[in-house]
Amino acid sequence: MPASPLPEAHRRAAAPRLPEVAESEVSRHYQAMARHAFGVCDGFYPLGSCTMKYNPKLGEDLAALPGFTGIHPLQPEHTARGCRSVLDRAGAYLCQITGMDEMTFQPAAGAHGEFTGLLLIKAYHVHRGDTGRTVILVPDSAHGTNPASAAMAGFTVRSIPSTAEGLVDLEALRAACGADTAGLMLTNPNTVGLFERDILAMTEIVHAAGGLVYYDGANLNAIMGVARPGDMGFDVCHLNLHKTFATPHGGGGPGSGAVGCKALLAPYLPGSALGGGGGAQSIGQVRAFHANFLVVVRALAYLLTLGNTGVRQAAEGAVLNANYLKHRLEAAGYSSAYPGLCMHEFVLTLEQLKKQTGVSALDLAKAMLDQGMHPPTMYFPLIVHEALMFEPTETETPETLDRAAQALEALLKTARENPQALHAAPVTTVIGRPDETAAARRPVVRYGFEEG
């Protein structure tokens, strides 16, 4: 096929201006950035709702095998049967863990998985001629991506309030359901780290109204191998392989937001779904080929390493570590937003501390940097004032949790005795308190030429 000329309007009039940088300078630049960065391999990283667990390096070794890195998605399938086996086995294991019937690995990340799952729900209702179902119900404690994904899929979002206990208000859910209900998006355990104990009643309410129930797998790490979303009444789910199944995440990817569903939604799956998909009712591809295949390789390595028993132990360890740290911090004088046992994460509120001392959640988080720890998630969920959300994960040792608790206890004492010290934090990092608003609105993302 002959090349077609680029239209004149899109051709360069002159050669592009490119940086002239020595390889040694490039190497030093990235080495310096690496020294300034902080990751799970550097220290305690309790970033709530992000599951920053240690990722076994075995997964990296296997994902680097030439048999995986040297394939091409358009080569004949009989020449890539090993790769096909990876997708099949990983999908089967994840269906077993979630209680779903089918799995697709096309979505490239969590929010992409949400969007895909919602398109399945939409296709289901449209195919049945039930086009009046245009509302997705979302708890007020949900991840911000939930309402955003629902809006992108063409739905109207209706918020469901939480009770004082941090759980979905059943009566409010019942009142919100109706003939316009397409579905409910839910995380369980929820975003404040509590298990929705009325989950069976909740899914029954939505199903009785004619809607479907979507499981946001962001917090699956707390229940994998113990309880299955499919058994709770969920019809479709997404999984963050780059969180729960120990494939590195952060920095923009690659990720994998695998989507699983019950048999009633299988006809609508994207074309490369396991066990079928791609028929007349399919929503169509949401990503080219098999998407981020090497992330699936890492996840399969993790699953095969742990086995059934290990997967359950990982979930139990995550819950144990969260409750241990929560108890230590409460004993030190911190206030929990929701007292009692938690699941894999918990939320502290510094509202009273701020009123008493002027020290905010931001101040404490910045001070943690000086202690060699990554801060927890700040000011989320939005229903908790001055929130700090901790998720220690199962890969942290008791000694690490003890050191973290001791450091946080010392910071609390400093907040009460010398609040100005926390207002000035951090003092040991290369960057102190940048103008985050300016950074978000005017990012510097290209090479800066020295003029003159």
Spans of features found by a protein language model:
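Conserved phosphate/anionic-ligand binding catalytic regions in large, soluble enzymes, centered on
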Residues: 38-58, 106-117, 245-260, 290-295, ...
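Conserved PLP-enzyme active-site core in the AAT-like
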Residues: 21, 82-85, 112-281, 320, ...
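Non-catalytic terminal extensions of PLP-dependent enzymes
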Residues: 1-102, 119, 227, 279, ...
